[in-house]
Amino acid sequence: MLGLIKKKANTLLGIDISSTSVKLLELSRSGGRYKVEAYAVEPLPPNAVVEKNIVELEGVGQALSRVLVKAKTNLKSAVVAVAGSAVITKTIEMEAGLSEDELENQLKIEADQYIPYPLEEVAIDFEVQGLSARNPERVDVLLAACRKENVEVREAALALAGLTAKVVDVEAYALERSYALLSSQLGADTDQLTVAVVDIGATMTTLSVLHNGRTIYTREQLFGGRQLTEEIQRRYGLSVEEAGLAKKQGGLPDDYDSEVLRPFKDAVVQQVSRSLQFFFAAGQFNDVDYIVLAGGTASIQDLDRLIQQKIGTPTLVANPFADMALNGKVNAGALASDAPALMIACGLALRSFD
């Protein structure tokens, strides 16, 4: 599978650096069944990461050090991801039968016609997808390119915590990997469905439509759980930390549900509906089989039910760990609550088994 940097390693920590937290996941596999060995989530300082870009390297490095302690893991090799919006991908046809080295050399010659940056500033990777449908003597090759600074800043943040980035992946591919674990939730093989995965983070909502297990459409929108946190702060005079805790643990005044939470849920429904309309307008589909909610905001009580009721499409909250065993040190309740926010970390941790 595609990764902008690959170095051979055994078990790898999946580390997702989002705008508000770092999430760590360690998986093992025995007899075809996965097991969660360790996981932890650690908040980031405000504005340490802005719109998927690491701004405060030191702050992110310190959060990574804390998340390692919290997870009680001894592993030092990790997989991180760059955002899909930072990556240029292009499927190109190439001669069949070339070795990996020959493909790589050929791509270096041809890459500048596909990439709008000087090649010395770019990390490039590729994956052979299979024989071309148009010409059986050629193969389809997926080319991925990303500015080196996006890769290097993630490597540097990990290094501050004593970690080595063995693979730098792409968030969209990590999502595809963890999505494949949702078959039992969806009641069907994920390869047979068209599913809208809506990842509602703190500041960004990403719609990824997967058809037969592959991402066919992505759209990012500036909208997320931070809007709810800010409204709690404003209305009840709380700090960011207090508002974030109250949002998760409750204890807010009686009017919270009707005056704050319900309008926010309605706004989420509107965002999901609008994103789907953009997807349908783009062409070949006018329906999806399921809506799957991911990200920290997905676990708001009954949000899935409200979306299903308003949009009319079966909706569920992602839990990639539903069929996994758990190490005794892993808190099952906390993991279930955090599961929808761990889709990318899970997809990254699965790189251990490539």
Curated annotation (Swiss-Prot):
Single GO MF descriptor: ATP binding
GO biological process, one term: cell division
Organism per entry: Pseudomonas aeruginosa (strain ATCC 15692 / DSM 22644 / CIP 104116 / JCM 14847 / LMG 12228 / 1C / PRS 101 / PAO1)
GO-annotated cellular components: cytoplasm; type IV pilus
Localization, UniProt: Cytoplasm
SMART domains referenced in this protein's UniProt entry, alphabetically: FtsA
Residues that coordinate or bind Mg(2+): D112, I115
Transmembrane segments: none
Disruption phenotype annotation: Deletion mutants lack surface pili.
Residues where ATP binds: S18, S19, T20, S21, V22, K23, A202, T203, K247, G296
Biological role: Inner membrane component of the type IV (T4S) secretion system that plays a role in surface and host cell adhesion, colonization, biofilm maturation, virulence, and twitching, a form of surface-associated motility. PilN/PilO heterodimers form the foundation of the inner-membrane PilM/PilN/PilO/PilP complex which plays an essential role in the assembly of a functional T4 pilus. In turn, associates with PilN and facilitates PilM functionally relevant structural changes that differentially impacts PilM binding to PilB, PilT, and PilC.
Subunit note: Interacts with PilN; this interaction modulates PilM ATP binding site. Interacts with PilP. Interacts with PilO. Interacts with PilB, PilC and PilT.
Record keywords: ATP-binding, Cytoplasm, Magnesium, Metal-binding, Nucleotide-binding
This protein's name: Type IV pilus inner membrane component PilM
Domain of life: Bacteria
Any Pfam family matching the protein: PilM_2
CDD domains: ASKHA_NBD_PilM
